[in-house]
Amino acid sequence: MQDQYILALDQGTTSSRAMLFDRQGNIVSIAQKEFEQIYPQPGWVEHDPQEIWSTQAGVAAEAVTRVGLNGTAIAAIGITNQRETTIVWDRETGHPIYNAIVWQDRRTADFCDKLKAQGLSEKVRAKTGLPIDSYFSATKIRWILDNVEGAREKARQGKLAFGTVDSWLVWNFTKHELHVTDVTNASRTMLFNIHTLDWDDELLDALEIPRSMLPQVRASSEIYGPTKTTVFASKIPLAGIAGDQQAALFGQMCTSSGMVKNTYGTGCFLMMNTGETPIESRNNLVTTIAWQVDGKVSYALEGSIFIAGAVVQWLRDGLGIIKSASEIEALAAGVPHTDGVYLVPAFAGLGAPHWNARARGSLFGVTRGTTSAHLARAALDSIAYQSLDVLKAMEADSGIRIGELRVDGGASANNLLMQFQADLLGVDAVRPRITETTALGAAYLAGLAIGYWQNVDELHSQWQLERRFAPSMQAEQVGSCLAGWQRAVRAAKAWADDTQ
């Protein structure tokens, strides 16, 4: 009998990817295809749902055939996806009635302000763990119902279906038979009660969204049903679903309360496992569901940083200081420190834990002696400082002292950044051998559901360290660095306040 593999589908914001994993958690094959970003007007971001499906189906087939395999070699499929992105389709035709409204889209910001003015903020946070924000799916659904001709009436008749990207993929993989999502994706809609684990009728009424549109909510690791498309000749169990950041937390094996991961991408996404009890944040973090496995729900605290790796892209594209992102480490390493220069990369405001939409990027402490190397180092340092702000908020909310930080994402390959992160935190930054942790998490969830892997203990034994960064900076020096950063953030906020 031929070896079998787990196929992980990683449907991201800019590309659809597919990876095959073997029993040791190694990547056997990978395929990727980018798709179009649609910007109808400033602040609006859309995707074509049919292109999401066609690119994802295409790379799924390519990842399998590239290594001479076919569908019979796939034991199960796990799906992970860009979260919050909203698709509404006609149940009869299977066709979307509007483009996917992407998580970054801000068109419903004014409507969110109206909901806040109605005094709904505390109710929404208590039920969903989320602040009222256009980032989440609820107001995007409402916009489609209000602005697409005939949508409201079709919804009333039960003819429309809503789904996050995972739901849309499962719907298509099962030839329109399964309309499901998992608890992690449901918890990002602003409509799901994370305590009762059900859609919340009070919130649905407040937003005038019919319950009939919503998918059935299932666990993150269970057999939802078999594929029925021509993508694969054989029927393969769809057996794992989780939003991208939750999948990364699972792929990093942060399965115990107090374990934390940071994904260093264009932005940073930090997530702390808080165990089987949701912790309501008092420090501007989001309370969310980490996963549901073996009947148990794990919760998490999450903080999002808008600009992380994007600050390196700005040095490349905006200032021309570097020709490629990979050059920044060598340039920054040319100086021992920033010489008092601080960059606050609030290009689109400040995310967690500040949540200041008006703050703008600011540079402080520049002298005639400041060089491109100092700027490069300040840019890298800003990623670590912002991450520290979120991690301190997590410690304050949870009462848990972080033992180590598990890192992944593109910028985690930067050794200078990882060392400075460890220095600031005072604990080790730990980089795994396999940094494709999002796809790995989806594979793990699917494999557990079908018995490909026996239990989480087996997965823990597979997790392998690539490098551990131990703190080496003196406490006095760390304190001085942090004091400067905090002054810079205060000044960036003051600048925004003074320009209203």
UniProtKB/Swiss-Prot annotation:
Class of this enzyme: transferase
Record's protein name: Glycerol kinase
Binding-site residues, ATP: 13-15, 266, 309, 313, 410
GO biological process: glycerol catabolic process; glycerol metabolic process; glycerol-3-phosphate metabolic process
Binding-site list for glycerol: 83-84, 135, 244-245
Catalytic reaction annotation: glycerol + ATP = sn-glycerol 3-phosphate + ADP + H(+)
Function noted in UniProt: Key enzyme in the regulation of glycerol uptake and metabolism. Catalyzes the phosphorylation of glycerol to yield sn-glycerol 3-phosphate.
EC number(s) given by UniProt: 2.7.1.30
A Pfam short name: FGGY_C
SUPFAM superfamilies: Actin-like ATPase domain
Cysteine disulfide partners in this protein: none
InterPro entries: ATPase_NBD, Carb_kinase_FGGY, Carb_kinase_FGGY_CS, FGGY_C, FGGY_N, Glycerol_kin
Keywords tagged on the record: ATP-binding, Glycerol metabolism, Kinase, Nucleotide-binding, Transferase
GO MF annotations, alphabetized: ATP binding; glycerol kinase activity
Activity regulation, free text: Inhibited by fructose 1,6-bisphosphate (FBP).
Pathway entry: Polyol metabolism; glycerol degradation via glycerol kinase pathway; sn-glycerol 3-phosphate from glycerol: step 1/1
Protein family (similarity comment): Belongs to the FGGY kinase family.
Binding site for sn-glycerol 3-phosphate: 13, 83-84, 135, 244
Organism: Burkholderia pseudomallei (strain K96243)
Residues that coordinate or bind ADP: 13, 17, 266, 309, 410, 414
GO cellular component: cytosol
